[in-house]
């Protein structure tokens, strides 16, 4: 299967806002984005987390306040993008090996 056939699926929302009971989300992954572009963006998001996590692990800076929010929002964004790609995989029709 060619990666060019894989696109993001519709409906992946993230970053809850307002009262929890309302189940509202501020952002949604754009459907039909090419997998290669999404994977690059996920890689970029995860790269932003290297310094804060390393500094926290080394005891140089605690993972709190803005650093903690950076990690949380970046991970939620990356997860939503990957979940949309995984659902997009399910929508790709695979060739039948028996034909």
Feature locations, PLM:
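Sequence/structural signature of long amphipathic alpha-helices
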Residues: 1-99
């Amino acid at each position: 299967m060619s990666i060019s056939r894989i696109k993001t699926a519709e409906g992946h929302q993230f970053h809850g806002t307002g009262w929890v009971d309302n189940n509202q989300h501020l952002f949604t992954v754009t459907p039909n984005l090419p997998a290669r572009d999404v994977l690059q963006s996920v890689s970029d998001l995860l790269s932003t987390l290297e310094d804060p996590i390393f500094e926290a692990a080394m005891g140089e800076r605690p993972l709190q306040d803005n650093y903690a929010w950076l990690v949380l929002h970046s991970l939620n964004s990356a997860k939503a993008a990957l979940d949309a790609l995984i659902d997009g995989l399910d929508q790709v029709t695979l060739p039948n090996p028996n034909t």
